[in-house]
Regions:
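Extended, low-hydrophobicity, polar/charged segments
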Residues: 2-168
Length: 170
């Protein structure tokens, strides 16, 4: 079942992430927001879709020195701890993937990168804070779209491990 929020949905085609969720018969909601020319940060997106900041998650794609890719899903108001990220995937060091390669590798663009439905299956890790929530907002697979999904469904669909990934702010 899909529940759609937002006035722009009627003009929008389903993304790969939505088609995969539909095929798997996973319940989710879709919400949209107006996209601007500038990069919109997660805090702004949370406000635009009426979500609590801790419910909105961003998808980061990192790579090792051999250009093997890993996906990390963390709250938009948090910073990925690169050492923790490398440790949980048994790598010495990881770097953010160059933005100019994101679409080629994942099929998605910056600001529209969903952990569901990438071109290839990558090892995915979701921040442990998601376990404290029933549902989370993730990118719907294009800028201006957010999927609201049960945490356990997200974990199952991405075959993710759940680990503490965020920097601890003191």
């Amino acid at each position: 079942m899909i529940i759609i929020k937002g006035e722009y949905m009627s003009k929008t085609k389903k993304t790969n992430a939505m088609r995969i969720l539909d095929r798997a018969k996973i319940n989710y909601q879709m919400t949209t927001y107006e996209v601007t020319d500038k990069h919109q940060h997660g805090e702004e997106i949370a406000q635009l879709v009426g979500a609590k900041i801790e419910e909105v998650f961003k998808t980061l794609v990192l790579e090792n020195s051999n250009h093997e890719h890993y996906v990390f899903v963390i709250p938009v108001n948090e910073t990925l701890d690169m050492k923790k990220a490398a440790h949980v995937v048994n790598e010495k060091k990881l770097n953010l993937m160059p933005l100019d390669q994101l679409k080629q590798v994942t099929g998605y663009v910056r600001g529209g990168c969903s952990p569901i439905g990438m071109k290839h299956s990558f090892k995915t890790t979701i921040d442990a804070s998601a376990r404290n929530l029933e549902k989370v907002y993730i990118s719907g697979g294009q800028r201006g779209m957010q999927i609201i999904i049960h945490v356990n469904d997200l974990i199952d669909m991405t075959k993710a491990q759940v680990e503490s990934l965020s920097l601890i702010h003191i």
